[in-house]
Design a protein with these regions (language model features):
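Generic structural detector for well-ordered beta-strands
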Residues: 35-37, 44, 60, 72-74, ...
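Short, polar/proline-rich extracytoplasmic segments that appear immediately after membrane translocation
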Residues: 2-62, 145-147, 154-162
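Surface-exposed interaction patch
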Residues: 17-18, 27, 61-108
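C-terminal, structured domain-capping segment
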Residues: 65-82, 121-162, 268, 515
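Negatively charged
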Residues: 161-582
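Strand-loop-strand motifs at the edges of beta-sheets in extracellular beta-sandwich domains
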Residues: 109, 124-130, 250-255
């Protein structure tokens, strides 16, 4: 009787599971196999129009299917300059269905733009890839499996003359911050920036006396771009450095306007970095930027420092940014102290090489979704997340680091990160890991078993202040080229098991404070050669725990060095260090 009841229960459970089908792993019978092109489509569009069309991607599609289609757009009914933008509206699609700019299952397709000069053959073809990611948990998948799936293509075309704006920012000390409103006379006191194509409020005479400037990239372009300031009615108190008296400074709203969509300059470095540094103090009052889809970044190659020190920005909508040509994103959001979130899901980073300090000191960012970042060409990730002390989660599982040479300070100060999966990191070309994990004090575990450190020269402070790490297996580390291990594990107060059995120290010259305040340390290290010249404070304030111990294996020529290292420990703890000649 019990067996019969059990059988009935199992059958009922099976029926419930089959009829609900809400789990990702239930798709066992619908793994995709289609790989191919859906077709070629030609759009003959007129200027100043919106064209919409559904494209059939196929029937009987299943998770993990992928494919592509070509779109050809023709704007041959005008002799004027013209441009078009193409986007895909994601409606009535599975949650895991992606449109991509490359056949890599990663690089998102957001928008595509093309600009034609008057005499051009106004024809453009773009290939769009698609992929149904079956790893995305979606309870509605079953309503799409085996059905026809379509892409809704929207093309906006417009006859125009490009309205390119200049970048008046300057690092020249004699330029006082830059020209026009980028000058330190104005930019620290800009409160809001608004892009618009409404010129009705433009001063009748556009000159500096009226706080108005022609900021067109070229004085010969037909479509002009203007920037003008309007008093917000708000003021701030500031100390006049020349008289030491307190003065009230007016705050302004900046409007950047043109008849047509404003095009960003190729080099947009620090273009919205509206601050000045004076009397050992940063002054910045920018609280919002509203692009209104009137800031076209399709030709931008550098966004370095674009929002540098926008310390009062709490929100930033850059979802319409076209980053397909961008090469440099270093310091892009550095010191955006009050940003709590950033939507970068539409960013195409396939050409980016420099992400140095990209999110440096974004202290209030709690989460950052970079799952669509293509980092295959990035060489510099130094200080990329340095100072992101509120980040609690960071998924870098899709990061391709095969070309990265610099990871200095990469996670320094990410003090709220409890876990970090770097199992997919390729570090074969990295030459510096200086302070890479410094002050990651919430990390309890760190698996670096796949790290290739054969080219690393500096591991200075690499794990310093990782106060919650208790175990660290570095048995696969190749340290043959490392010269600097200064404070490598300093203040790792919880670190007990540390496997350094295969450490090659033959080229190391600096081990200053290497195990400073490692109270619970249990490890064994081998010292060979005579290259180590600085081992001061190596075991200072360390080995206080009753179970702590260190074994120093040394070659005959390194005997005096080993003895000197032992002497750096507190006198009462030197007995916990054993010297063994090899």
């Amino acid at each position: 009787m019990k067996k019969k009841s059990l059988l009935i229960l199992l059958v009922m459970c099976s029926i419930i599971f089959i009829t609900t089908g809400t789990f990702a792993y239930y798709r066992y019978s619908v793994n995709g196999s289609i790989i191919g092109k859906t077709g070629n489509y030609t759009f003959n569009v007129t200027s100043n129009s919106t064209t919409t069309k559904d494209i059939n991607l196929g029937s009987n599609l299943k998770p993990f299917d992928k494919g592509s289609f070509n779109l050809t757009v023709k704007l041959d009914n005008t002799d004027c300059d013209a441009y078009y933008t193409l986007k895909i509206e994601k409606t009535n699609l599975p949650k895991g269905f992606k449109f991509l700019s490359q056949d890599d299952n990663i690089s998102p397709f957001s928008t595509h733009s093309k600009y034609f000069d008057g005499g051009d053959n106004k024809t453009d073809t773009v290939t769009i890839y698609w992929y149904w990611d079956g790893n995305v948990d979606d309870e509605d998948d079953n309503s799409f499996i085996g059905k026809t799936i379509s892409a809704n293509i929207v093309i906006n075309s417009k006859q125009t003359n490009p309205a390119y704006m200049k970048n008046g920012y300057s690092e020249d000390e004699n330029a006082n911050g830059g020209t026009e409103f980028w000058n330190n006379t104005y930019k620290p006191y800009v409160r809001t920036i608004t892009f618009d194509n409404n010129l009705s409020n433009l001063p009748s005479t556009c000159n500096e006396e009226n706080l108005c400037w022609d900021i067109s990239y070229s004085q010969t372009q037909n479509k002009k771009v203007y920037g003008y300031l309007v008093d917000s009615g708000l003021t701030i108190e500031e100390t006049d450095s020349s008289t030491s008296t307190t003065v009230n400074k007016s705050l302004y709203n900046l409007y950047i306007v043109s008849e047509a969509q404003t095009f960003a300059p190729n080099d947009s470095s620090f273009i919205f970095s509206f601050y000045k540094y004076e009397n050992s103090k940063y002054i910045s009052n920018l609280i919002s930027i509203n692009f209104n889809n009137n800031f076209n970044t399709s030709n931008v190659t550098s966004m370095s420092g674009m929002f540098y020190y926008c310390e009062k920005l709490t929100d930033l909508d850059i979802s319409n940014f076209n980053t397909a040509k961008v090469i440099r994103m270093s310091k892009m959001f550095s010191f955006c102290l009050k940003l709590t979130s950033l939507d970068l899901s539409s960013f195409n980073t396939s050409n980016v090489t420099d992400m140095n300090a990209m999110f440096y000191n974004c202290v209030y960012l709690t989460n950052l979704d970079l799952s669509d970042f293509n980092t295959s060409n990035v060489t510099d990730m130094s200080a990329m997340f340095n100072g992101c002390l509120s980040l609690t989660n960071l998924d870098l599982s899709n990061f391709n680091t095969s070309n990265v040479t610099d990871m200095e300070f990469m996670f320094w100060g990410c003090s709220s990160l409890a876990s970090l999966d770097l199992s997919n990191f390729d570090t074969a070309k990295v030459n510096s890991m200086y302070a890479t994990f410094y002050d990651c004090r919430s990390l309890t575990n760190l698996d670096l078993s796949d790290f290739n450190t054969s080219n690393v020269a500096s591991m200075d402070r690499m794990f310093a202040d990782c106060t919650s790490l208790s175990n660290l297996d570095l048995s696969d580390f190749n340290t043959s080229n490392v010269t600097n291990m200064d404070r490598m594990f300093a203040d790792c107060t919880s670190l007990t098991n540390l496997d350094l059995s295969d450490f090659n120290t033959s080229n190391v010259t600096n081990m200053f404070g290497m195990f400073y305040k490692c109270d619970k340390l249990q490890t064994e290290i081998t010292i060979t050669g005579t290259s180590i010249t600085n081992y001061a404070n190596m075991f200072s304030n360390a080995l206080t725990d009753v179970n702590a111990y260190v074994i120093i294996n040394y070659s005959s020529e390194a005997e005096s060095i080993a003895q000197g290292m032992k002497s750096t420990a507190p006198t009462s703890n030197q007995s916990k260090i054993t010297l063994k000649q090899i």
